[in-house]
């Protein structure tokens, strides 16, 4: 019975979703794709700020309490859409990480039942290439409510604390779910 309800939900939801996408169609009801007018450098620029919680996964972190592993996180980025489907951004992600280790390390402090608590700063300066899948498949529509944007990137990852630091090259990939709130403000859920 549950399956029947779920299937019915998807069938009916699909009908409503397609009914909302008619603003970028021509007289024959085909999706309009380009040509796109190019713009000046500072057109289609965006800025993002986010906050959250970091949860560090290390070798012995399952031994420590969950609440003591949570640390503050921050994300700031600036980007530009070059076409309705292709964009790029540069940004900072990080702030702090907490965890547990079985041996004294550069970032470890006090012992707790044979384990050492670690607390250190983290930062990731990165550049990402973004592809707006919604615009690529369904054509550009300025008033679209939801955009699905996969991205890949590369950057500099740094951990620091207790007079020690570590630098690495990092790679990232993810998905942006962009929900339009008004013409100048979006809510973005990033995974």
Which ranges hold each PLM region?
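Short glycine/proline- and aromatic-enriched beta-strand/turn motifs that initiate or cap beta-hairpins
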Residues: 20-79, 161-164
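Outer-membrane beta-barrel domain signature
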Residues: 62, 74-75, 80, 92-94, ...
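Gram-negative (and chloroplast) outer-membrane scaffold detector with strong preference
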Residues: 85-171, 181-183
């Amino acid at each position: 019975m549950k399956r029947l309800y779920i299937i019915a939900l998807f069938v009916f939801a699909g009908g409503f979703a397609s009914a909302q996408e008619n603003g970028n169609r021509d007289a024959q009801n085909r999706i309009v794709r380009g040509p796109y007018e190019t713009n000046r450098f500072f057109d289609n620029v965006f800025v993002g700020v986010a906050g959250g919680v970091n949860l560090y996964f290390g070798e012995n972190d399952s031994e420590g309490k969950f609440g003591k592993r949570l640390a503050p996180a921050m994300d700031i980025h600036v980007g530009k859409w070059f076409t309705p489907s292709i964009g790029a951004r540069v940004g900072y992600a990080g702030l702090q990480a907490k965890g547990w280790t079985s041996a004294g390390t550069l970032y470890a402090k006090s012992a707790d039942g044979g384990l050492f608590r670690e607390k250190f700063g983290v930062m990731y300066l990165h550049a990402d290439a973004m592809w707006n899948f919604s615009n690529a498949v369904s054509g550009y529509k300025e008033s679209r409510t939801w955009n699905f944007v996969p991205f890949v990137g590369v950057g500099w990852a740094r951990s620091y604390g207790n007079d020690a630091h570590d630098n690495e090259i990092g790679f990232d990939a993810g998905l942006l779910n962009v929900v339009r709130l008004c013409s100048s403000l979006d809510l973005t859920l990033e995974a």
